[in-house]
Amino acid sequence: MATRGHVYGGRKKANLYCSQCDEQDHCLESPQNRIRNTSGGRTSDHLCLFGRDCGKAADGTLNEDCSSALLEFASGAHGVYTQVFYARRDAAARGATVSGYMGTVRFDWCANELHRIRHHAPFSAVERASSDASHFGGDSELAHDFIGLIEGTTEPRTPIAAGIQSAYACLAARESAQQGRFVAVRQVGL
């Protein structure tokens, strides 16, 4: 897995808002240019994406602007995950593809679609999630579950073993990127 922070972050002063910047007329990330270019993102005044406080790899405060992972499963299936946060409009990219001998499944989180393709049959399917079922709300859902668990008002929707397994996968992915080789993912033994 590789993660990069090459686009955002930079030399602008910390806590700089677009409305305070003398480059807002030609900065592609300013609210007026996001509106003019229909490039998406927050169209109200916001912190500068090129400020020192946006993060950088050198000091461990990386603000990811893209990530990729190549996965190989025991069955021989391969998977690819990618997210490119600075890609906009029709080029927006965040998803995963897993292909085995019998078929391929592709997740497109920007379009809220799941594609299933059977390799040896003339059938394919596309499932579309409603707009309120977006993948992008995951962090707030995790926080909601955590608060409910602490307060004793709800049961978690996901077992702790799944969270630990996810952490193991992330640690293995980081080691794989650092070492430039495949790394076995430690398994949960609960």
Residue ranges and their predicted role:
Residues 139, 143-144, 170:
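A general structural signal for well-ordered alpha-helical segments in protein cores
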Residues 56, 129-137:
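A short glycine-threonine-serine/GTX helix/turn-capping micro-motif
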